[in-house]
Curated annotation (Swiss-Prot):
Family: Belongs to the class I-like SAM-binding methyltransferase superfamily. RNA M5U methyltransferase family. TrmA subfamily.
Organism of provenance: Actinobacillus succinogenes (strain ATCC 55618 / DSM 22257 / CCUG 43843 / 130Z)
Protein name, UniProt field: tRNA/tmRNA (uracil-C(5))-methyltransferase
Keyword Disulfide bond: no
SUPFAM superfamilies in alphabetical order: S-adenosyl-L-methionine-dependent methyltransferases (SSF53335)
CDD domains membership: AdoMet_MTases
InterPro entries given in the database record: MeTrfase_TrmA_AS, MeTrfase_TrmA_CS, SAM-dependent_MTases_sf, TrmA_MeTrfase, U5_MeTrfase_fam
Length: 369
C-alpha cells in the first residue's frame, strides 16, 4: 500500500501558500484564503496500467501498477489512498473477477476509474485487441456480479477505434454547495474536477465573490456547467462556451436537472467566441443567439494549464469584473501582467486540489480600477 505523508500535510500546504503569495505579490494581492483538502481519499478518478505476472502460477496474476516518476520503474498498487474509498473497494474486487475470465483479462493493459460522492462508479477497461460479442457477454456478466456485490457500476470497453458501452457512459454526481444540492452528469473520458470536496469549496467561493452582481455573466471553458450552473443564481442571465461535444451534452442535461432557466451554452472555443464578439467572422452556431441581448459585466474563466491566449486576455479585460480560476499559477501570473494594468485583485484563494504534489489551484477576483 502506498503511504501518504499525512503528518506533513500542513507543512506542505504552508509551502504552497508561501509560493502562491510570492507569485501574486507583484500584483498587490490581498492575503490568501486557503482551502485545505481532505488528507486522503480525495481524488475521484484514477487510472492504472495492468501488469500480467505469469511467474506465480499457470493462470498468471493481474496487478494495478504505476511508474516511479524518477526511475520509471513500475511498482504494484493494491490500494491507492489518494483515490476515493469507492475506487479502492473496486480495485480490490474487480481484479480477481477479471482474472477468472480469459476473454476479459487477455490483452487488458489499463483500467480507468471515475467515481462520485453519490457512490456511482465507471470502470473503463482498455485493450490491445478487438472486442467481440463474447467479450461483451462476459463484461455484462461481470457488471451483474459487481452490482450483486453492491456497486452502482458502469463498465466500458475500449480498444483501437472501439468503444463498447454496456449501459451508459456517465455517472450523476450530487454536490452539496452551501445549503443547496446540485446534480452534475459526468461523462467518461471528459474533464471533471478531480477533488470533489475542493470543487464544492471552489463553487462556494465563486458564489460568494459574485454575490450581489449586476447584469449578466459570460463563462469561457464551461465544461459540464460545473461553475455556470452554481453561479446562475447570482446573475440575470449566463452565457457559457464549451468546445467538447460530450461536455456540452452533459451541461445541457445538468441545466435541466438543476432547473436553471437563465443559462445558455454555445459549443465553441474561447478563441472562436473572441472572433465572434470582435466581428472577425460569423458562426452558424450563434444563429438564434443575440449576443447584444446580454449585458455581461462579469466574466468567469477556468482555462487549461496554458492559460489564456493574448486575444482572449484582451477580451477578458473588457469586463468590469473577472473571476479567474487557474490550475497553473505561472500562466495565471503571465495573464495578470496584462490584466493588472486595468484591474485590481480584490480576493485571492488557494484551493489544495492536489495534495502531496506541487500543483496548485488558485482563484482571483478582479475589479476594474
Amino acid at each position: 500500500m502506498q503511504q501518504l505523508p499525512i503528518e506533513k500535510y500542513d507543512e506542505l500546504l504552508a509551502e504552497k501558500c508561501r509560493k502562491l503569495t510570492a507569485l501574486l505579490a507583484p500584483f498587490d494581492a490581498p492575503a490568501l484564503t486557503v482551502f485545505p483538502s481532505p488528507t486522503q481519499h480525495f481524488r475521484m478518478r484514477a487510472e492504472f496500467r495492468l501488469w500480467h505476472d505469469y511467474s506465480e502460477n499457470r493462470g498468471g496474476n493481474l496487478y494495478h501498477i504505476m511508474f516511479d516518476k524518477t526511475t520509471k520503474q513500475r511498482y504494484r498498487v493494491d490500494q491507492f489512498p489518494v483515490a476515493s474509498q469507492l475506487i479502492n473497494r473496486m480495485m480490490a474486487t474487480i481484479l480477481p473477477l477479471l482474472k477468472e475470465q480469459d476473454v476479459l483479462s487477455r490483452k487488458l493493459f489499463q483500467i480507468d476509474y471515475l467515481s462520485t460522492l453519490s457512490e456511482q462508479i465507471i470502470v473503463s477497461l482498455l485493450y490491445h485487441k478487438t472486442l467481440t460479442d463474447e467479450w461483451q457477454e462476459a463484461a455484462q456478466a461481470l457488471k451483474v456480479r459487481l452490482r450483486n456485490l453492491g456497486f452502482s457500476v458502469q463498465i466500458i470497453g475500449r480498444a483501437t477505434k472501439q468503444k463498447i458501452c454496456l449501459d451508459q457512459d456517465f455517472v450523476d454526481e450530487e454536490l452539496s454547495v452551501g445549503d443547496k444540492k446540485y446534480v452534475y452528469r459526468q461523462v467518461e473520458n471528459s474533464f471533471t474536477q478531480p477533488n470533489a470536496a475542493l470543487n464544492c469549496k471552489m463553487l462556494e467561493w465563486a458564489i460568494d465573490c459574485t454575490r450581489d452582481s449586476q447584469g449578466d455573466l459570460l463563462e469561457l471553458y464551461c465544461g459540464n456547467g460545473n461553475f455556470s450552473i452554481a453561479l446562475a443564481q447570482n446573475f440575470r442571465k449566463v452565457l457559457a462556451t464549451e468546445i467538447a461535444k460530450p461536455s456540452v451534452a452533459a451541461a445541457q442535461f445538468n441545466i435541466a436537472a438543476n432547473q436553471v432557466d437563465n443559462l445558455q451554452i454555445i459549443r465553441m472555443s474561447a478563441e472562436e467566441f473572441t472572433q465572434a464578439v470582435n466581428g472577425v467572422r460569423a458562426f452558424n452556431r450563434l444563429k438564434g443567439i443575440d449576443l447584444q441581448a446580454y449585458e455581461c459585466h462579469t466574466i468567469f474563466v477556468d482555462p487549461p494549464r496554458a492559460g489564456l491566449d493574448s486575444d482572449t486576455v484582451k477580451l477578458v479585460q473588457k469586463y468590469d469584473r473577472i473571476l479567474y480560476i487557474s490550475c497553473n499559477p505561472q500562466t495565471l501570473c503571465e495573464n495578470l501582467q496584462i490584466l493588472s494594468q486595468t484591474h485590481r485583485i480584490e480576493r485571492a484563494a488557494l484551493f489544495d486540489q492536489f495534495p502531496y504534489t506541487e500543483h496548485m489551484e488558485a482563484g482571483v477576483w478582479l475589479m476594474r480600477k
